């Protein structure tokens, strides 16, 4: 029996890792389209899963039981001894961008996570999987309001600039959660962070809508390749406040450090001639991060939870293109970032988890809200080291359902469906306001692999 279990587990782990590469390609091919992904490391991906995205992204104080919770690795210690959990999720988004009376609609989709976990022994749980860390995906064009006079023909010339970007960072991780004594658990996630980005800026000078050959435009490509580690620690403590009520507190810490990566700036003319290549090694950082949470559970019917997150982006560096009197440089700077924080509130209600009749009595009803301050500064003009303004704040409202999948052997697998409204609102009218409607779909397979059957 033990040999059968070990073979089954090792075979599934091998299969999951073999399928990981094409899944990563799918994740990189889509994602939210946003002009703000041009700055910093792009849009930071929501690290919550389908079930807790519908609860506003809470999870620091929530344990893993019949589902995985990667927001706090200490939660893995609470996994059931009979279960192997496989969790996967994807999302589709429909966005509306507006500025100065102009607007455009965008849409996209992405694979958000593929995770697995099981209990190794009493009080010790293991989880591993794939989750994107950041996404870069944009393509937009600006036209200068003021025209220039062609010194040869005397005609008015306008400068049109196209900005395109793609890429992002992905992570694979493995984590352990351990419960050294009753009601207290600790854990750690160790991850590999890799990826890169390309930011392209192409200029074109036109006269009456046609290209003007008397102007040679400067064009730029910013390229980066990244390979580094990510390390996060967590703890949870639960105590009973009444015969039917539990209160859990949780905390996490993520280590900040320099990236092992290289970044390059390519500068070339419209004719295709390369003028210069400027590089920066180890010029990227990720921040120290801290989170705390509290959760109250009434029987198995009602859960209320609140989280607060803080990331020290203000001291992190990233190379920035600086144009000063015709001179182009590409130094690393910490002026592109600012410290950010986020707040999350969520609730889950299950009318009767043990109901044998009435399917909707076992459905989990979820709702949540969230707020996040910006982690990026938006440069004004052409200088990455000059004046800047804050990036957009994010406001979110979410709701969803956990729909049980039941059969004679298993009643803990679940389809998690959620809807989110997300608004990115800048502090100035000169920047773009974004509104998104997001559909999340996740499936949690909770299979009883380690149950012993008696054969008669």
Language model feature labels by segment:
Residues 3-6, 63, 163:
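Membrane-interfacial loop-to-transmembrane-helix junctions in polytopic alpha-helical membrane proteins
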Residues 12-16, 66, 280-281:
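Residue-level detector of alpha-helical transmembrane segments in integral membrane proteins
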